[in-house]
């Protein structure tokens, strides 16, 4: 500050002390939100005319706001009021508010360069910020935004009364209110927490390995390679060494063509039964029995011509949308004992029908499915195939009738195999026998219906 400003401040202070005081001290206090109030501290002696100049000229953040001598200062408090001393300041009003005028009462205490708080507030604060302090604060905030983080000495929210304020070049340097300006500490990086619940990158040096969340447990990770290999049977590893054979224990003989409707459908008689055999000298009986009890064998059935070289599943061109062989064309294995008491693996086809008359063969294909590799392999290889003997499909007039169920069929039925039992009928001898199956009932009902029609035609 120049010498001229100091002399001007000293002259102004003398003129203010010489002015008559005409306003009473009982003047109401101005609004608490628009006045910056100051109070001297009797703990220290006056510091000179420089502090008197600061008492009259206060700086606001929006510009220099000159506070005239008519404003009431905290030194003009009544006798019964005892302000608390301190080195802070309090800003009771808004930054841009204009204070109200107050007459200057007579002095009761000598002015001091130390500041105290008003009796209307209990918070401690510091003196107003000078333009240089505001510029310094703005530069610090700019450095913080640009990544340059200066190191600040630790500060306290309250200033001790025993420590006098420091001055630079004869000027009192105001302190900064730490309640209003948060201190800048050293920079700490906190990695953001994502909303999707995924852990942060483990390669980052700021991430602790103990804070990482483990990946969710998957069932595929629980099964080790050894457990997976043990869950598979030994047939997978020795398929090329084993010799699979199919023996048709019950050959199809005759069938009645069912046409192109679903109502008048007849099954192939007798129902085909195929047995799986494994012949390998390197395997014991227990190992062979284990292979035969494998539950994931699947056998499919298709129809071939009389020679057995051409697939006859497709119909003539006028009925291209339909198949010749209909019914349940796939069978699961059934492990049981035959009529001789020997255990075996059987595949039964009790629901096969042919649409057109002719001579045909049935073609059986065996496939072994591995459930573990079912998602990886689109098609499993064929183990073995077999063809039946030639059977004849008759029209409704030429069909000789159903045969009685064999001992093998009855034996498998007793053990739980899903297959129908028939007593059989012989049309050549004009004998009718009741059948406990649906096919036998349909044949008997059809014969009765035909007899009624003949009687009606004879009466007419």
Curated annotation (Swiss-Prot):
Q: Show the ranges annotated as biased composition (Basic residues).
A: 451-460
Which biological process, per GO, is one annotated for this protein?
A: sporulation resulting in formation of a cellular spore
- For this UniProt record, give its keywords in alphabetical order, as a comma-separated list: Nucleus, Sporulation, Transcription, Transcription regulation
Region (Disordered) spans which residues?
A: 67-131, 152-216, 422-460
State whether keyword Endoplasmic reticulum applies. no
What does the entry list under GO cellular component?
A: nucleus
Bias category Polar residues: which stretches? 192-207
**Pfam families, from UniProt?**
Velvet (PF11754)
Tell me which residues make up the Velvet domain. 239-422
- Can you say where in the cell this protein is located? Nucleus
Q: What is its main location?
A: nucleus
* Listed Gene3D superfamilies: Velvet domain
Query: Transcription: present as a keyword of the record?
Result: yes
Transmembrane domains' residue ranges: none
Q: How does it assemble?
A: Interacts with VE1.
| Function comment | Velvet-domain-containing protein that acts as a positive regulator of sexual development. Dispensable for regulation of conidial size, hyphal hydrophobicity, fumonisin production, and oxidant resistance.
Q: Which family does it belong to?
A: Belongs to the velvet family. VelC subfamily.
- Put simply, this protein is called Sexual development regulator velC
Question: What is the organism of origin for this protein?
Answer: Gibberella moniliformis (strain M3125 / FGSC 7600) (Maize ear and stalk rot fungus)
Report the gene name: velC
